[in-house]
Every structure is written in C-alpha cells, then in structure tokens.
Amino acid sequence: MPVKGRIIRVAGPLVVAEGMEGIQMYEMVEVGEERLIGEVNRVVGDKAYIQVYESTTGLKPGEPVYGTGSPLSVELGPGLIGRIYDGIQRPLDVIREVTKSIFVRRGVKVDALDRSRKWHFKPNTTLKPGDKVSGGDVLGEVQETSLITHKVLVPPDVHGRLKWLASEGDYTVEDVIAVVEADGKEIELKMYHRWPVRRARPIIEKLEPVEPLITGMRVIDTMFPMAKGGTGAIPGPFGSGKTVTLQSLAKWSAAKVVIYIGCGERGNEMTEVLETFPKLTDPWTGKPMMERTILIANTSNMPVAAREASIYTGITLAEYYRDMGYDVLLVADSTSRWAEALREIAGRLEEMPAEEGYPSYLASRLAEFYARAGRVKVPGRPERLGSVTIVGAVSPPGGDFTEPVTANTKRFIRVFWALDARLAYSRHYPAINWLVSYSAYVETVAKWWHENISPKWLEYRNEAYEILLREDELREIVRLVGTEGLSEKDKLILEIANIIKTGFLQQNAFDPVDAFATPQKQWKQLETIIDFYHAALEAIKRGVTVKEIREKLAPKIRELILARYNVPNDQLEKLDKLKQELLQALQELIEAKAGRASAAT
C-alpha cells in the first residue's frame, strides 16, 4: 500500500515529510494538494527528504505527501521522436493544450506518449507461441517516422514463454500486443513500458568505439575526432560558442537519433533550437531534422531540481533507442547547471560541502552519467549493436578549467574540445583551442579513415597538428625579434599554419556550403594544404624564398583558404584542379630560380 505522510518543512526545492515509514530511496512521490512530482533522496527514520521537480511556492506544513511505490520512471514506446519534453517527460505542446496557457503550471499531469494515436504494428514473423522470450527480444516493428523504424522490445525484466502475439494492424500504445507466461502468471505486454531513469538499461558487453561520429566540423572530425559510443565535453567561458557548436553537432552528426537536453541554459537559446530544428533538413537523408530528434527543454527559469531529472530522462531515452540497434547522440547543454542543482540540493540537505561548495559525490554522479555511454552489444534477438555518444557542455566560471566540474569531467571523458575566449573574440569559430584540446580516439578511428577515405589520413592529420604546435613555439620568437630572424623553413611554417587555421579549422555554422563538410571534402582540403607544404619545402631547398612564394601564389593561396565556401561537397574535382595549379606555380618558381642561377654563372 502506498505510503502517505505530511509535510513538516519546506526549504526551496527540498521538502521534508514525516510519517513516511516504508518509503524507499529514489521513490517518486506526489507532494501537497496539487500532487507535485518529487523524488526521495534521503530517509531518516520516518522522515523523507524530497527534492520537488516543480515550484514549491505556496506549499505549507501539514499538506499530504503520497508515495507511488515506484521510482521516477519514463515511458518508452513509439511517439517519442519529434516531441519536446520538460525535464520529467511531460510534452510541452500537450501541457499548452490542457492548460490553455503559455506557462507550465504546477501539478499538471499529462501522458508522455499519445494514448489515442494508432500505430501500424508489424509482428516479428520469426516468433511463434511457445517460444522463449527475454528482455530485448524484438516483438515487432512500428514506422515511427520516415527515418526511424521503432522496434517494439520485450522489457528488460520480463522472461518467459510467448503465449500470444498480435497480428499486423493498427494499435494504440495502450493495446496489448503480446502475452508472456512466466512462473504460471500471464504478463500482458503493450507497445510501451516504463523504466527507472537512474537505472542503466542492461547490456551484454561493451565494445571498443572504432567508427568515427562524423559531425561535418573539420576541427572535430580531422583534428579531435569523436567515436560512436564515445564521451566528450565542450568547456568554455561565456560567449565562446558552446551552444552554437553543440547545435551544429546535433544538426549534422551522422547519428540515427539525436537527443538534445537544454539543461539550465537560457530560455532564448532553447527557443532558438525549437524554432530552427523543425525547419532544418538532415544532410544524410534529406528528411526533416525533427524526424530523428527528441528535445528536452529545462531552462534556467524552471525549477532547479528538475535539471537533474532532465539529464537522467535524456540518457534513459538514449539507451532505449540504442537497444533497438541505433547510434544515438546525446547532447547536454550544460552539465555545469546540473552540478549547480546538485550543489543547491546538497546545501538544503545540510551536507558537508567539498571543493567550491559542490557535494563530495559530484565525481561519482558524473561518472555514473558518462558510464552510460558506449558502443555495446545489446540483449535480445536478433543480435544488435548500438551506441550512445555523450557530449556535455561545461560552463566554468571565468573559463577556469581547474574548477571542480571541468576537472572531474576530464576524468571520465576521452574527447576534450576546449573553447577559447580569445579565439572567439577574434572571430575564429568554432573556437576550439588546438593546443589544449585532445582526443583519445585518433588512433582507433584511423582504421575507418584509411579504409574509407585515404591510407594517408593519419600521417597528414599528424603533420598538420605538428605544424600548428610548431607555429605556437615560433610565435614567441616572432614577438621578440620579428619574422626576419627566422629561417625560410620556419617562415613557411607560419604561412602554412595560417592557411590551416583560416582555411581548414575555421568554419561558418550559418553558411550553406561551409556548415557541413563531408569526410571526402575534409580530406581533399587537408591533402591540398599538406601537399602544397611539401612542394613549398622542396622549393625552399632549391633557393626559392617564402616572400617569392607569397607574392607569386597569393591569389591561389587565397583561393585555397576560401575553398571551404566556394567548393561544395559534390564538386571536389575543383580542389584537385586547385592543387595542380598550386604545384605547377611552385614548379615554375623553381625553374625560374634555376634559370637565374645558371645565367648568373
């Protein structure tokens, strides 16, 4: 029987209730006369400490608290794609219809999935009554959108013999589509099931991420690649372009499903996402972007405690689509706001603060979250591989990467895209600092690049990276003595580094051609730059100066830098032609130099 207690104290998002004998940790409760949704996060005797996911204004001691007997859970079934939810999986469009208001009122109860919509269910023809079924087995399919075929799965905790499976037809998510017999009991399975958000869905084994998650952003794909099933973070101070970079990731990534969590960020940023995503076209399929996207809007003016729920809601939805065998990208903007919510709740609970006031369990919570990423073999028949890639924004105050959230996040991620305010202020976007950023997936994804694009990819990528590092060392010398004190080879390094920075690393997220670069275009650009560098080195050995190269080839070098705008993804022969023209011009310089030298002798 569900527990019923009463409120004795209200402190911001924290409510203390007594008479709660039998309540469990992380049980979902309904607080007050309006039955606000909350979650138990501490139990002392008959007292329960509850974090409430809605505004507690007006709650008073004496009001009832009702236990539900189950943990905070989400509904998993067809109808999730294309929806916009709040942090506790309430669809915002349905709330507006129910309340006839543009504001999210307290205590609103709406279903996460549309109970009236009918879906065309196609049963799995390999399953017959009497067959053994277990968690993860595919019962049938539903065409959720033109991009996503939704596999209806046996819930992870159900095992038994299939007694009955529905025939092909139109059903709502509430209709029973299968009956499983287990331990003498009949379990009715519907098209949806519920799953606790704090509990990771089971897997068979984790696999090494080996395939790159192509994002269309050159600085990421070529310099600091992300793998499908990987973990990454984008830390950066205010105004450095975190949100635009994350939105570009969500727009152009080669993931089958994208889940975008706006966690505690400004409302106008979430509004921008809500306005732009429905109008965008997926570059991989040509279909509307919303046909593969789920948005979770939990802005800074919504209750603080719901930030934590939104992160867990998002990762649970991601795991569900991973279990179908899809590659899922989860983008969280920003994990710092979630950490601040943890800090506030910990303060209300009067826990001993650790560094900068954050709770001592900050690291373990971050670890739990990032550990749910991965490329995995999922349970059930037929055998499937799926992946969840997590990219979290971090907003360190003043851009200080030593603060606790950034420092702890770095322990659990393998890709670190550090945004630099100086680059952003000089209009270099994405403002990813190549001296501070790193990726542990460069070697593992190199095999894919070698097999699909070019066997020289890793060699050329490393050479470009070394040029950038060498340029940073030379910049200090140039500040002291100017460029005249450098050798011709070092002067060439500065010239090529400038081409790499402005013609390759920079990218305009709002330009129709430059916003997304295919792996083939990225390789052609990189190959042209590095081959030009090799030819220029040879020219310098033959006595040609960098000044002569700059003067003779200025128009062609400018053309190379602007190729990111002027060469569409389907016209890469233009880059081949440009490379030949550059190499030919260098050869002419060498011949002219040799001719002058022989004339002088």
Swiss-Prot record:
Which EC main class describes this enzyme?
A: translocase
What is this entry's stated membrane topology? Peripheral membrane protein
> Where is this chain primarily localised?
membrane
Localization: Cell membrane
Provide one Gene Ontology cellular component. Answer: plasma membrane
Report which reactions are catalysed by this protein. Answer: ATP + H2O + 4 H(+)(in) = ADP + phosphate + 5 H(+)(out)
- Kindly list the biological process annotations in GO that this record carries: proton motive force-driven plasma membrane ATP synthesis
Task: Could you list this entry's UniProt keywords, alphabetically sorted.
Answer: ATP synthesis, ATP-binding, Cell membrane, Hydrogen ion transport, Ion transport, Membrane, Nucleotide-binding, Translocase, Transport
Q: Does the keyword Cytoplasm apply?
A: no
Tell me the GO molecular function terms.
ATP binding; ATP hydrolysis activity; proton-transporting ATP synthase activity, rotational mechanism; proton-transporting ATPase activity, rotational mechanism
Where would one find coiled-coil regions in this protein? none
Q: Where does ATP bind?
A: 236-243
- Would you say which domain of life the source belongs to? Archaea
Q: Does the keyword Mitochondrion apply?
A: no
Q: Mind telling me which SUPFAM superfamilies this protein's record contains?
A: C-terminal domain of alpha and beta subunits of F1 ATP synthase, N-terminal domain of alpha and beta subunits of F1 ATP synthase, P-loop containing nucleoside triphosphate hydrolases
The catalytic activity of this protein is classed by the Enzyme Commission as: 7.1.2.2
Q: What assembly does the database describe for this protein?
A: Has multiple subunits with at least A(3), B(3), C, D, E, F, H, I and proteolipid K(x).
The text of the family note is: Belongs to the ATPase alpha/beta chains family.
Q: What does this protein do?
A: Component of the A-type ATP synthase that produces ATP from ADP in the presence of a proton gradient across the membrane. The A chain is the catalytic subunit.
Q: What's the protein here called?
A: A-type ATP synthase subunit A
User: What is the source species?
Assistant: Hyperthermus butylicus (strain DSM 5456 / JCM 9403 / PLM1-5)
> What does the organism's lineage look like at the top?
Archaea, Thermoproteota, Thermoprotei, Desulfurococcales, Pyrodictiaceae
